[in-house]
Amino acid sequence: MSLDISKYPILALANTPDELRSLPKESLPALCDELRTYLLNSVSKTSGHLASGLGVVELTVALHYVYNTPFDQLIWDVGHQAYPHKILTGRREQLSTIRQKDGLHPFPWRGESEYDVLSVGHSSTSISAALGLAICAEKEQENRKIVSVIGDGAITAGMAFEALNHAGDIHPDMLVVLNDNEMSISENVGALNNQLARVLSGSLYTSIREGGKKVLSGTPTIKELLKRTEEHLKGMVVPGTMFEELGFNYIGPVDGHDVNELVRTLKNMRNLKGPQFLHIMTKKGKGYEPAEKDPISYHGVPKFDPSNTSLPKSSGGKPTFSAVFGDFLCDMAKEDSKLMAITPAMREGSGMVRFSKEYPNQYFDAAIAEQHAVTLASGMAIAGYNPIVAIYSTFLQRGYDQLIHDVAIMDLPVMFAIDRAGLVGADGQTHQGAFDISFMRCIPNMVIMTPSDENECRQMLYTGHKHTGPSAVRYPRGSATGIQVNNEMQALEIGKGRLLRETKVTDKGERVAILNFGTFLANSLEAAEKLDATVADMRFAKPLDEALICELVTNHDVLVTIEENAISGGAGSGVIEFLMKNRLVKPVLQLGLPDEFIAQGTQEEMHIELKLDSNGIEQQIRDYLDL
């Protein structure tokens, strides 16, 4: 349910950018206050990304006020911060549906609005896309302006610098806005972020500035000289020097929460020629004290009461697979001082907070740099250490060449703990972990494990850690099954599955064997009970348990493979390839994710829609058997 807009009288007059631009400039600060309150009250009722949007309210208002969107094109990097943009571009009444099935997309999405120029979700893509648009805008000669907004976390990625370097070389008319809030999802790391965080606060700059003021403050002429010297010194210290060297005209840093100052600055920059760089300083979670104090926790929030000073506690219950991984890391590090855990800026989401505190010398946050994270691990493996890369399935896509070139070709013992494998829920198309089995299965030397529950996950993590070549353990987002986890760890035999249920031998009907890969096992067993089918927990997508497959082929009329991965190229395809290679002709029904980008919705909702719940599995098998 949308909020009562009558409580937000100025925001009510700005449902579109055209309406916003008709407002007097004097009303913009009050509009920002209402927009921030509306955002807080809406997201707290529905859940979603909060702190990022709170931090860019003034910037969003100023950009749409100065630029003639949608003719002028505005690109948001990643998109967590785009809720105010959605509110001001005709989607205010639908904000209560964001991240829900059939609701507003969680990020800017081309199919949703003409104001969303680029569909986003992954970081560091905005400058490259903006550069492409700017090149074409110049060719069209329509005086179209192009703006990209990127955060201080996203700009650390190599792709962003590749785009900056190219833009500085060819000199198109475009604006890059750096939203510097000293915080991405996890705390930013790396030399660049350290420099950004030290703007105007470095000891050299501060001591010279303050010392000079004390000595020379009494002389007006000297004071003016001191001011100029201060500006010159600033140019040597702050990141502007670096961006100027890349070919950009650097302006900043500017207060990102002074909307009228932002409007003035943007108007001044709008018609400047060549690549422009505006550096603004903001506070993530601005205007809501709990989010300002803890922007990591308030990055993505459940439903909560804004009048409380903390988010609701988890109800406990079943552990998440991420927590199982985190516990494994801590337990394994007790006995292996050469274990090295790497994450590309996903410490909290990957369950690594405790490990990072207890074993700081074995923990490495590579920042938003998946390519670097993978090759960093290869270097550690070459040095005789035991690296583990904790990475979301969707982000491993960004390190694919490194997985092949820097790990698999050399057969290095790097284990990939692949979180968010399968459907992730509310984040939708850009974050579904739909492809990792498919793109890893074709890589020589890879071992791919698909645990069905948390205990199997723990044992597979141990198996991968002890393996002498590259391996991957893939597991889904969210709660595990709740079974007892065996603290003792034992390496599994590579490429061996297990038979869990056997069909009764009858002369009636076709005998069905379900080959399960991963956490659909409970659904498979439930469907099998109704169908009297055999169920095998295959465990390994590569190498396959070929002996078990041969046994199932011999004793059954139909095979059914099931996995939470794209059907195309997945584990089921591997089963068929093995059968054809060995002239084992048998009908095979492949169940999994269809050949489409799957939209947002809860995992349960989407499993039902895709007929991957127990009832759906049963029905698909019955339809295939024509029962």
Swiss-Prot record:
Query: What is a biological process (GO) this protein takes part in?
Result: thiamine biosynthetic process
> What EC class does the entry list?
transferase
Q: Which SUPFAM superfamilies match?
A: Thiamin diphosphate-binding fold (THDP-binding) (SSF52518), TK C-terminal domain-like (SSF52922)
Q: Which PROSITE patterns match?
A: TRANSKETOLASE_1, TRANSKETOLASE_2
Q: Per the similarity annotation, which family is this?
A: Belongs to the transketolase family. DXPS subfamily.
Subunit relationships: Homodimer.
> NCBIfam families this protein is in?
dxs, PRK05444.2-2
Q: State the name under which the record lists this protein.
A: 1-deoxy-D-xylulose-5-phosphate synthase
**From which lineage does this chain's organism come?**
Bacteria, Pseudomonadati, Pseudomonadota, Gammaproteobacteria, Vibrionales
